[in-house]
Amino acid sequence: MTVNAFTSCELICRKILMHVAVEKGAKEGDTFATYLSYLEEQGFVTPPMKGWVDLIRRHGNNATHSLESPDKKRAESTLMFTAELLRLIYEMEYMSKQYTEET
């Protein structure tokens, strides 16, 4: 973000979400929208997050198909959401296993 690579930020976050969906069971080769729907259906994206996910989908489409660079605020929003989703999916899953396993 400090080098103003806002398009790159949007695209890498999009790619990360694709990888997460496939790692969690989505079929590889589907559309980005299908990956996001899969994450919703599996409960990784909750109803309050749905609007934000749709915004990321639209932003990702713009970054992919338009030469106009996204602004800093938009890229930061996508990055923040992606980071938090990774924490929820992976860190919380790990922590849950640590504290709920019977000893």
Describe the residue ranges of each PLM region.
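Short, solvent-exposed segments of well-ordered alpha helices
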Residues: 3-7, 47, 69
